[in-house]
Amino acid sequence: MEFQIILVVIISALVGLVIGFFIRKNIAEGKITSAEAQAKRILEEAEKNAEGKKREAIVMAKEEVLKLRNEMEREIRDRRNELQRLERRLLQKEETLDRKMDSMEKKEESLSRKEADIENTKAELTNVLNRQLAELERVSGLSSEEARQILLNDVEKELQHDMAVMIKDFENRAKEEADKKARDIISSAIQRCAADHVAEATVAVIPLPNDEMKGRIIGREGRNIRAFETLTGIDLIIDDTPEAVILSGFDPIRREVARLALERLISDGRIHPARIEEMVEKAQKDVEVQIREAGEQATFETGVHGLHPELVKLLGRLKFRTSYGQNVLKHSIEVCHLAGLMAAELGIDVKLAKRAGLLHDIGKAVDHEVEGPHVAIGVNLCQKYKESPEVIHAIAAHHGDEEPRTIEAVLVQAADAISAARPGARRETLESYIKRLQKLEEIAGTFEGVEKSFAIQAGREIRIMVKPDKIDDLAAIRLVRDIAKKIENELDYPGQIKVIIIRETRYVEYAK
């Protein structure tokens, strides 16, 4: 029974499959037939559309060709018209050019005729001029060249006279303007440079706490005062002046050393030859410090920098030098300021002018030790310490020993004269007195064996320290006579001069 059911099911399935196959086949064949029909219809429609588009494209192409043809014809027509217009303009220009050429030819012919007429006229004038010249030569008895030379000479003389008058007029006006400008510059510089320094004295007054100190200064039998004067070379004057003693000497350095030493001795109270010698040595060292500080202060005050240290030290020594009673350092600072002010007015190098002004008298710092004028000494010093040629030239020319070649040299010369000529700055008699004392010491220093010499008592006495190992007692007698004889022959002086030779021998031993 189950087998039959299974068989029926299988047969039913097979029949279903066969029926389904045929049904599917019929459906597929129907779809194929429908698709073929649709494809055919689409092809037919496409052929119809393609034919229409082809005809439409042909029509559009024909229209485009026609349009392009019309544009080309219009452009060709426009260009033809433009060419015709240009041809007409060219023809007009050719006609105008032809007319101008004709006119030029006519003018050229006219100019040729006029040129020929001018040549003829020139030839006639030349003939007339030659005849007149010949007649003038016959009448005057001179050739044309001689007459021309006479005329040129007359003209030259007249021109030379006129030029001389003009040159003199210009020179006078230039001198007047230069003098006025120079006066204005110098007046301005003097007004702006206020200097209150006047001539220095050759004495220093030392106050005392009481008159009893005078006896201590003199010492037993005058040994203290003799030791002091011998060591310092300065006169110590003790008179009736209450509570004061006077130091007198022409050398400011010695006078300053003596002043410092005496003030310290008075303050210390212990006054005897050994103490005096100790204080004098300390005072000398202090003066050296003062010299250096004075040089540095001078460069700071004037604004002149970059100087060699030795030049700065020499500037400081000028503080203790005088020229006709005028302090040389203050004079140099004044010249520096004046030269700088005048240089500023003229618009030239102010620093160079001030540097030359400050160093112009540097030779006076060592003129006691070195022979020769202070100008030459200053030039040598500045060359040694590598100063510029302009500064060296200004120093060499400031007293007229050399012709000034630069404006700065002229300004230093003028500033030096202004400072020296200022009322109260110098005293001629004092300078001659100091020079006589210096000469007195120089004469003593020329002899061999002399260690140092001091002119004291206003030049009426000179004390000479000799080297004991070179000068014995007999040689000292001969030496003092020789020095006195040389002073008589070479020096003019009033009255008489006392020459003293001091020969001192020291033997030192320490007790241990």
Swiss-Prot record:
Q: Which residues form the HD domain?
A: 328-421
MF annotations from Gene Ontology: RNA binding; RNA endonuclease activity
- Spell out where the chain crosses the membrane: 3-23
Domain KH, first and last residues per copy: 202-265
What main location does UniProt list? Answer: membrane
Q: Name one GO biological process term.
A: mRNA catabolic process
UniProt keyword list: Cell membrane, Endonuclease, Hydrolase, Membrane, Nuclease, RNA-binding, Transmembrane, Transmembrane helix
EC number of the protein = 3.1.-.-
Family, according to the entry, reads as follows:
Belongs to the RNase Y family.
What is the recorded function of this protein according to its Swiss-Prot or TrEMBL entry? Endoribonuclease that initiates mRNA decay.
- What is the designated name of this protein? Ribonuclease Y
